[in-house]
């Protein structure tokens, strides 16, 4: 199971953490309590496009997260951000970029 990030303290900690970018998406990672499930949030700004495009990108990011859920560290908090290039990226490109980002987080 994957939880949503809802508390302000976690968002503040994530924004002060180091950001990694691979292709059209970026990821900020914060280790946490391994007894809890991983927590995920998505940031898709207006620079990506109109609401229809932003929602499509967000749905694709959620689907890619579910495809890689075994790679998420228990208790960790992840913030995935989408840049303007994400609007024209295919699901396969977003999925590959997320896989690379999660592999980098695994090594740290």
What does each model-found stretch correspond to?
Residues 1-108:
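Positively charged, solvent-exposed patches that mediate nucleic-acid binding
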């Amino acid at each position: 199971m994957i939880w949503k990030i809802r508390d302000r303290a976690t968002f503040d900690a994530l924004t002060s953490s180091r950001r990694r970018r691979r292709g059209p998406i970026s990821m900020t990672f914060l280790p946490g309590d391994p007894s809890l499930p991983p927590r995920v949030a998505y940031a898709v700004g207006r620079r990506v496009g109109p609401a229809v495009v932003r929602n499509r990108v967000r749905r694709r990011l959620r689907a890619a997260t579910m495809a890689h859920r075994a790679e998420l560290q228990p208790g960790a908090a992840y913030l995935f951000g989408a840049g303007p290039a994400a609007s024209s990226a295919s699901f396969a490109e977003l999925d590959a970029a997320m896989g690379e980002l999660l592999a980098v987080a695994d090594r740290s």
